[in-house]
């Protein structure tokens, strides 16, 4: 449509709200343009008027115009028609609601049946949800039999009435008629009058839609509202179809089959049926046909109208085409994955995209993508023509559409578009400013690259284009892991962003280097892989030497090489360089100590024999071989450290250069793996054969043992299970032993081993399978089962349990498998394939549900996490407000220390004579001893650390785990400070411990997750809640800071000087602020992906716990499904029962508890039951029992009359083992019989120590039944027997089928002296759950006992407990196979499921029952039902969520769309206009020849010039930030969140440019601050330009650009605001023309002769100046006086840090003029 209206610059209004409702018959008629009366579509080859393709409804012919709007086929959107139905019919979507309404109102007078005084009705009126309200009103009216009578005047409720009067049936003005029972059958509504005496009224009749319509029409509006139906939008009578709208032909297009015939759409067929049925009904009515024929015709019309809307009605035949294919109704068009909502609105096919196969190219940078030239010729980017690029655009247009780089279209300002393929006239290619040129994409353009399935955020990333020959996308190898791509034929998609805003977002948020560290598990997702990883290990070995020619070639592959060749490690006999030396050139300035994967822990730390300890100091690799642990995507790897210390750009360079250098070296060295690498020597092979044969013999012995019943069963397992487990143990051990002996035989230079140790491919299991033995094949976790007459294959004998016949493969892959081994191996492999296929679909659906449940959860600007309704999910993201990317594992040192250790580490024992020796300045010692205040401070500090420790142990981390992911790696910061300030660990520090304590206190107080304004809220509770949230957020980190920077440790362990310590404090603060999560971040989607992605890697099956207990545990995907579906019935319900401390350590006592809990019936302990006819109770016929029967009757029970006993005897023999195991006695069991049957049974039992345990039970006849016939006694006894066995509970808790005991020796406890130890406890696991009853057992520790049944926990313990249980269960499922997901993602899922106070399942029954908008709900599941409900109950959608906005094609309020940008119009008035250069001599840094760093990342726009440090209301778009300046691009510490910038890339404040720089001339005609890619370092900036010269007279520091009146350096400029630390209007020596002038530094002056460029302090012209230099210039683009954050890797300082001297902007730690002692102002924090 857009093509047919002239373009307007006016912004489109956003849709604020969507109101749903039902069209009334009048509305349908009014909007209709034609009444459809004929089923035919054509007449004489033309569309028939009044037919289904009436020309008024829109044309379907290219040559015709529409009769209604005169538009052509392309322009006319179509217009509705209508069909007048002869009789009203039910609408299938509304019929259930109509039925409910009929049950609420009187059949005769349409009054609401219930009375307004009724309590239940009043409660119903309070329900906000209209649908629920209707259901509640239906419940109120359910039991009404009569429409109550009464005068209208009594409607007003008289409050003076008494309760009794009120309770009487109130007369509410009904008609008094009897009400029928109303039911629905298929499409009919049936009324049934139950007790009608009148013969004239039929008891049961069909209620016609006409009659229903009349009833509904009479309903009053207020009654309607009471039922939840809003008469303004959806009256009840509109739910009956009287007029049917006919959709316009464009909705149901027809296709030409051949020249004459047309194929009509399904809807057109259906409408034709409706029209035919309607005509037939009209004809019958006209002819006065009998009622039953009319009813039949109506029913036929009803059927067609119903199947037109929904063709899947249960109980109705489907409407079909002639071919028998069911027609696609309106409902089928909307629902499901391919339907309108999900298929065409939520996800669409898009333009400007490409897809092809990917191949590898290690010479590309990780953020590049090689694009085939053919694709680059086809994809375009609309570039607006400006004076700066007009020449370039003309050149592109000259190249035309078929030559790259060229252009495809020109779009004029009025919107006309010229296709350059067909342009005839030269005048059409004329360009003016403001036109748009659709140019080909070119090197350096940013694109989005994606590989499906997009399981996590890193599946779509921004890349820069590199146009290359041939037809595949080229990709760096390191990027394959986040995409999960390989090069075996994978295809990937590329999308070209079309606006500057989008490009800016891609560059600032999505680029690959920014995604290196993933928030999912706070570790890198990209590392060095494949050849490079293998090469790196070989390259950094001790014996890797290179000659000069190779070194020179390698240096060529190092783009960042500074031109200095490192001195050779070996000079004689010839010069040789080591690999470590060259690798050091790549490593940025970091400090790191790590171990390789093959490190032996027994080695001494200082010296590693196998070179397995990696030491990097200041970027020099001093020792260690680099393998996957150091270079891979691991936590704490080099990549992780570089990313955190130096930012994404340095990290990108490191990965790129490692690949180019190492690959080049590896090509020269060569690497190959042949079959020879897998062949072991004969001695090893003999060893392997021996191992396997001995294992086979062991299995034989086991079989013999089992057959001779000499087998000890393990508790809870049968003989066969125990046997299988033992066999498995033996065989697996054999495989491992054989494998390890094969591995040990491999020499160091074995190529296979090289790959495995480097971590680039393969594992040790692969080696052992290739060389030694493939091992046992399993199906469903067991050995190959018997499938053919008690054997696995016909080739084996029956009942062969030996290794070979049950799937043990003793050959290696090298030797080859025998046929039967091959077959078993294939069985095992097939299972894996099936498993994967099943798993993929399941996890895909889980992920979709998770995303739909959490898609609208985001961080808001008050640091809370909320959904689109504004419900608070969390008060602070992850409870600490930190972004998952910025946390690293750190250990809290004080947690596990005992009291003596704690005192040694943290307490200042001032009075000891040797206090401070060797670590404190004697003057300071004296001061501390004599100053009571200091001593007080230090003692308080120790107490604080102690209280921290007890808080940690008792509340925060009772488990005693000291390693936690926390922001700001403190240990590394200390290391860096020691290196940076040259701290000698043997020297004493000049610090006063009290200063340390005070500084740390101030620092901790400043660490806030949100800069709180004074809360204006008067609400005490509100403020208290916020205070608690903020306190909790930083509590753990504060404890970490306090325990690490305790004054004694700073002085003894770290020996920091005052300067270094203050630097560290500043760094902590700035890094903490950088680690905060950004508002607008969609943490819900992130959490869903972080949980869904590992689920894809999960195993599907339930595994047995290896080991003793046979407790089954559901794990993997099925368990995850149970948790998020909140399954009522868990597959393996189980309790973990902890006992009270005195019981827990005693096995016998634990056994007693076990037997008390286990549910035991008589059947469990019975071995046999028999029924005898034994007529004489005193002398039994069973000889075995004679003894104890006689002894019983010697002392008979008085009450028992022998003669009343039945002659039939039930004799139960008990299983002695079970009875003793359950700790029962015969008396206990008899007691239970008496308890359940009283005196009607007589029970005699043998002694507990008798050989057999016997119960003898007889019936006792009561007085009344005496003497009656006893024939059926034995039958009765049989029934009693079965009842006793199954029902009679001896002891235990119902539901707990079995209890298993196990010990846990990892239970944390605090020892006597305050240390942290572990103790062993007996723990009970149950099969079956009954939490409440178990917890009430006196010996059970109810505080620790848990259940894995989530529904049970909420019933017993409530919502907070359930949240914790959910977290625990999710963590268990995910960590089972070694994955790790950061807590914050699991927490969001748990919070989303519980925040409403009840459990919300992640299914349609949970997600779709929340009060979100109908559009959002219908995009998940139950699409049509939800939309129908929305219409009936006239719901509104506020369009706040993600889905609604996407459906409406709007920018959703997320990420950069969650705020607006204002334009400061006053500043525009002051803006300078710039003289535009003549188009002819503009130079283009964008031409492919010149790869300027600035060009590589973006382009500019001509916004008014302004200062980059403005207030947020500044005249610039949000598109670009200051980080775009060429120097900031590699700015190590740049953080997108905190630095402001402007929409062009170059500013005068860029560190590469400075007024003192001789190479800049402000009057040069080809320089303009808004030049899109101007960079003074750009090689294409022509030095021969006449006005460009270092000595050029036109350069003058007072040029209008830097004059005091210049807006960018004027005293009113915000970058020199009076609050800026370096500005003081009264300072006599301050001059706005010298931005780097520092009044307090006498030795600093740009012209000072003693100032040398190699001086460690700052010089803008110095070649060695770099953003990573120790001093950071205040003119750097990411520095802003208002910005609390600074460069994370900058060794220099952050402006808000206390030691940053405000009067010394060019502070440098090594500057001799710096003295902190005088101008140290800790409180200089910008408000």
Swiss-Prot record:
A GO MF label: DNA-directed RNA polymerase activity
InterPro entries the UniProt entry points to: DNA-dir_RpoC_beta_prime (IPR045867), RNA_pol_asu (IPR000722), RNA_pol_II_repeat_euk (IPR000684), RNA_pol_N (IPR006592), RNA_pol_Rpb1_1 (IPR007080), RNA_pol_Rpb1_3 (IPR007066), RNA_pol_Rpb1_3_sf (IPR042102), RNA_pol_Rpb1_4 (IPR007083)
Keyword terms: DNA-binding, DNA-directed RNA polymerase, Isopeptide bond, Magnesium, Metal-binding, Nucleotidyltransferase, Nucleus, Phosphoprotein, Repeat, Transcription, Transferase, Ubl conjugation, Zinc
Residues bound to Zn(2+) 1: 66, 69, 76, 79
Disulphide-bonded residues: none
Residues annotated for Zn(2+) 2 binding in this entry: 106, 109, 147, 175
Subunit structure: Component of the RNA polymerase II (Pol II) complex consisting of 12 subunits.
Family membership: Belongs to the RNA polymerase beta' chain family.
Protein name as it appears in the record: DNA-directed RNA polymerase II subunit rpb1
Organism: Dictyostelium discoideum
